């Protein structure tokens, strides 16, 4: 198991470059990157973060590149870790510090962005991907499969009635939960159509859209709802599925990314077709299941601590090279 660095005479320093990171305006944007950073810091590693691009216009990458160069001139680093391809391009503008690039899934592998990913991958010292399929698509055979982990200390089961009381919700509805930013590729339209179809036979069902919520509040929503739904066109290894599993929340999802592998044969969790009729049918089955799942037992292998272990092993392999 990788060591912590608190007792080291010289502690290696890491710079994380990312286009996704939570802020006051977008508290749920890139929380999995923040969790990994905090996990590394908890092991004793000094980690600085540069946010480039993100939700701002594309020209903001130029400003981000300037801030990146200013930072590496002011501070010496032992490794630079970039999340997503555009951050990786910015980080590879320098050649003096080893670079790890984490590619985060199928959405990056489409069209010209996918071409850019495959172009960048050989220029990184180490690469992480979310799944074996993602590794094959990227075309780098020595890529490390490191799916984002779930914080099992934050995402814990609690009584549904207590969660609803804390949210001020009445207890006369069954609730379908969507978590995330409703961008077109998240297919909220499909979810809404499926819930509307289900309401013809189950009028007490409603859709809850949890957008713009602070990350620490998401477990409350998951424990207060009856089923999580995911309908994205593209995902790599969606953290929200693992978070729902950690809360023992039933799940209905399209077959995207590694969802089918993560939920496995967990009772109360269903993979549906990408149409409103089958999604409504599977939502009905999840609601009829009537209680919480055993998802937490299944997901323990994907705990955040294990992801941090894997990242540290990659860093150490770089630092041990002559």
Functional labels for PLM-detected ranges:
Residues 15, 141, 170-186, 192-195:
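Conserved donor-binding/catalytic core segment of Leloir-type glycosyltransferases
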Residues 82-87, 103:
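Short His-centered aromatic/hydrophobic patch
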Residues 121, 220-225:
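Short alpha-helical donor nucleotide-sugar binding micro-motif in glycosyltransferases
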Residues 133, 149:
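Carbohydrate-associated surface elements
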Residues 156-169, 292-293:
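A short helix/loop element that forms part of the nucleotide-sugar donor recognition site in Leloir-type
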Residues 233:
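Aromatic "clamp/platform" in nucleotide-sugar-dependent glycosyltransferases that forms part
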Residues 241, 250-253:
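Short hydrophobic beta-strand element within catalytic cores of glycosyltransferases
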Residues 265-277, 284-289:
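Conserved acidic donor-binding segment of nucleotide-sugar-dependent glycosyltransferases
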């Amino acid at each position: 198991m990788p060591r912590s660095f608190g007792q080291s005479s010289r502690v290696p320093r890491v710079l994380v470059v990312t286009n996704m990171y939570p802020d006051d305006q977008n508290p749920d944007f890139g929380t999995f990157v923040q969790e990994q950073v905090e996990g590394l810091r908890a092991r004793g590693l000094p980690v600085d973060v540069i946010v480039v691009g993100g939700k701002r216009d594309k020209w903001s990458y130029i400003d981000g590149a300037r801030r990146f160069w200013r930072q590496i001139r002011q501070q010496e680093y032992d490794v630079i870790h970039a999340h997503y391809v555009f951050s990786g391009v910015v980080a590879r503008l320098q050649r003096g510090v080893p670079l790890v690039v984490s590619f985060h899934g199928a959405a990056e592998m489409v069209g010209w962005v996918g071409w850019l990913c495959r172009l960048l991958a050989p220029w990184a010292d180490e690469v992480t991907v979310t799944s074996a399929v993602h590794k094959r698509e990227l075309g780098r055979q020595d890529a490390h499969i490191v799916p984002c982990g779930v914080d099992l200390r934050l995402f814990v089961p609690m009584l549904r009635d207590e969660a609803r009381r804390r949210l001020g919700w009445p207890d006369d509805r069954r609730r379908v939960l969507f978590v995330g930013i409703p961008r077109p590729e998240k297919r909220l339209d499909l979810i809404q159509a499926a819930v509307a179809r289900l309401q013809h036979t189950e009028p007490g069902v409603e859709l809850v859209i949890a957008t713009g919520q602070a990350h620490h509040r998401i477990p409350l929503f998951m424990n207060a709802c009856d089923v999580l739904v995911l309908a994205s066109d593209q995902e790599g290894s969606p953290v929200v599925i693992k978070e729902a599993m950690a809360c023992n929340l039933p799940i209905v999802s399209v077959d995207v990314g590694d969802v089918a592998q993560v939920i496995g044969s967990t009772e109360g969790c269903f993979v549906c077709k990408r149409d409103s009729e089958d999604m409504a049918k599977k939502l009905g089955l999840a609601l009829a299941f009537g209680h919480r799942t055993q998802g937490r037992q299944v997901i323990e292998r994907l705990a955040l601590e294990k992801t941090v272990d894997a990242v540290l092993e990659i860093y150490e392999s770089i630092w041990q090279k002559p």
